[in-house]
Amino acid sequence: LAWHEMTCASPAYLEQYGEPRTPQELAGHRCLLNSHYSGREEWLYHQRHELLRVRVSGPFASNHYNLLKKAALVGAGIARLPSYVLHSELADGRLRWLLRDYQTRSMPMYLVHSYQGGLPKRTQVLADYLMDWFRRSGEALDRL
């Protein structure tokens, strides 16, 4: 399983400031920064084997995905967030997926547990649930 970062903004933000058509245009926008990462002011995109590095800035930084999502929902700026936190807002139109033609970072996910001769039933149930949830979440994004 893996998740990838998605660039998004609210329709209200896009109406007021316009929609960036290329990653380079993000330099002129209000971006919501993820302080969880070092180098948060540089967003990376890939297209046709070319790496694009964009310096961004904005009014707000947080290491909490839900705060960044809420800031994007109220029109404070453009956010880059993990796909798994955005599927319902993208599906119902409260956020719009930007720069879809450009690839962003993809992160694998692992479930790590100790091995002592077998996986406890409760751990297996949790693993099955998470695998199914992330699979369905990815399928929902593919339909957008």
Where are these regions (language model features)?
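Short beta-strand-to-loop elements that line the ligand-binding cleft
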Residues: L33, R53-H64
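Short, hydrophobic alpha-helical packing/hinge segments within bilobed ligand-binding/sensory domains
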Residues: L67-K69, L86
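Hydrophobic residues within well-ordered alpha-helices
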Residues: L26, A71-G75, L90
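Beta->alpha turn/N-cap motifs
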Residues: A9-P11, L81-Y84
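Alpha-helical segments flanking ligand/cofactor-binding loops in enzyme cores
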Residues: Q24, K69-K70, Q124
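Ligand-binding cleft/hinge of the Venus flytrap
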Residues: E25, E42-R55, E89
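C-terminal effector-binding regulatory domain of bacterial HTH transcription factors
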Residues: S83-S88, D92, R96, Y102-L144
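Flexible hinge/capping segments at coil-to-helix
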Residues: A2-L32, R48
